[in-house]
Amino acid sequence: MSDFTKQTITEVISKEERPIPAAILAKKVLEKIPTLNKTDVYKLIDLLIQENTIKKLENNRLVIGYLDYEFDHEIKQGIITINSKGDGFIKEDNTEIEYYVNKKYLNGALKKDSVKFVKLKKEPKNNLQDAAVIEIVGHAKDHYVGQFITLPNGGYYIFVDDPLFYLNINLKDTTGLVNGHKILFKIISQTTKDAIAELVHIIGHKNDVGSDVLSIVYDNGIDPTFDPQVVDLASKLEFYVDEHQNKIRRSIIDREIISIDPVGSKDIDDAVYVKKLNDQRYFLGISIADVSFYVQPNTILDADAFKRGTSTYLVDRVIPMLPHNISNNICSLNEGEFRMCITCDMVIDKDGKICWKDVYPAIMKNYRQMSYDEVNDFYEGKSRFESATLTMKEMLLEAKELHHILRNKKIKDGYVDFDIKEPKIILDETGVPIDIKIYERKTAQMMVEDFMIAANEAVTMFAEEHMDKTLKEFNLEMPFIYRVHDKPSIINLQKFEIEAKKLSFNISHDFENIQPNTISNWLKMNDNHVNLPLISKLLLRSMAKASYEIINTGHFGLASDNYTHFTSPIRRYPDLIVHRLLWMFIFDSQSYTDKQRVELVNKLKLITEESNKNEIIAVKTERDVNAAKFAEYMNLHIGKEFIGVVTTVSSFGVFVELENTIEGLIRIKNLKDDFYDFIPENMTLVGQKRKKIITVGNKVRVRVIEANKLTRKIDFELVAQ
């Protein structure tokens, strides 16, 4: 009740245009909460004064404690972000209006919190109205990671990993903690400057190998461990084929199926079989691990997979969506093992069109677990691939033919392959980055990618064709999860156009009617452009984000009208659900009740929403880990010079990307050859004396002057040329 009463007191004060006497404040609070007595209200008023939440003026009237200016009585709500200086910016809900919040007016709000705020009666600066937070509606997160540091006086301090976190942390219990421990803690309560927290988990010592990566994992809300009950249930699962499964599944054991994955892969969820039927047609069979057979609905295994949503692939580890006995053993299509699978068979003509398709549950055997390196060496003539059978080698050559056919069709349809460089961070045995290489995407990688795209399209069309008949019995809409990708927004394309002009990159201007092949044609028209890699990256930034949805709106980037994610159920929850839908509505509908089907259909919207959130978290975690390792790597190269390309120009500096994909900032103060003015109209910096222009696409030589692993920031200075 006291927290609610405190909130009521601050709300009453906030709505007053002038300072309010304590007696009138108490009266208004009692009108809102009649069950209180006046003494309790006055006690809480005194407590709020002590906490500096409210302030008593010389005339004994009360105001919000931290406000030095008069404020508008209208209370607004929005999401707050905080910059590196500690100041806030609130985007008002349901509007595009943004407000500036000086750090002294944050009132305990942390980044991405939902807050109530009031405008201050103060002259706007930089077109932003000043505001002050008066209430925290909801925290974006309550779990944080920090380092436990002991002090000479016997006390301690929690150095929080998040550089934007400014509250002083007091732990309820420090038992077992030693200097240097990295910990996960949960905030229980807070004031504007302090917080009481409970210890959730000791991650390890800061000097432990991998504790840096684990700290980022926990800070992003990912649990790298499984509940013992989940592990126990998973450990009891084993491969078996009962009479019903034997009857309902087709045996494709005689097919010489192979898998092609990165070296060392342990969670193999897809395998391929290719056969050239004649000069006009190819047979393509894609077999996918049948995770849904083992992970049944309404089990703790399924609940945990739903909560995680995806596996997370990091520089030094994989955090799986499912326990290892499932992801690396009974569901992984390991060489020489019989496995449950769902297979998508297709016949594809010489133009890349899928002429026939069938999707069904099966039992398979992986005859050879191949690596991308092995297959690429075979294709490039570097290896005779002696360990593969003659049949396998013939199949690989036919698969390569089919890959080119499928790729040419997708390009003709408008598929855009941005071919963005991906970094591969090499660590030593202590987890220190010793090299940054570029991940090579060769024929084998692109071939498997094209085969999986074909399977995802075929399964979507198959489901729509076969579910329609079943659904008439249940009066349900098409229950499915699609992977969709909207066309880029006009605003984003207009921003890209500004950059394109500066780089002399020619594009058409009909943004309203943009089609997938519009963008591929832009790249074709400029295929010899010196800055094509940078342009591809800028263009990719302007694209919409792909997502999981229950309504099919097509996939713009793949130039596909029908697309889902079917091929990775070991590591993606939506794929598992697509398999489950196939079982419930097509493969074995008589084994499920209408109630079970309706229950799953009603949950699909929630599944897509949570899967989208979990995907964002996983991607952010991967980027955060890479950024930390980049900074750690560059810290070993302070003072060294590198060649890079300007990727962004702003009022505070210039971002430069090196050939190894590492990006750093040249702050304005580190452009020492001149004083520069920022020209916002064309996003350039112009030297006042020498009139030198710095713009996107410039090739520059930089020197590393600072790299901070914790903030994940790298600073360069421009080397005179």
Swiss-Prot record:
Pfam families: CSD2, RNB, S1. Its EC number is 3.1.13.1. One of its GO terms (cellular component) is cytosol. The keyword RNA-binding applies. It is found in: Cytoplasm. CDD domains: S1_RNase_R. Residues 639-719 form the S1 motif domain. Keywords: Cytoplasm, Exonuclease, Hydrolase, Nuclease, RNA-binding. Belongs to the RNR ribonuclease family. RNase R subfamily. This is Ribonuclease R. It comes from Ureaplasma parvum serovar 3 (strain ATCC 700970).
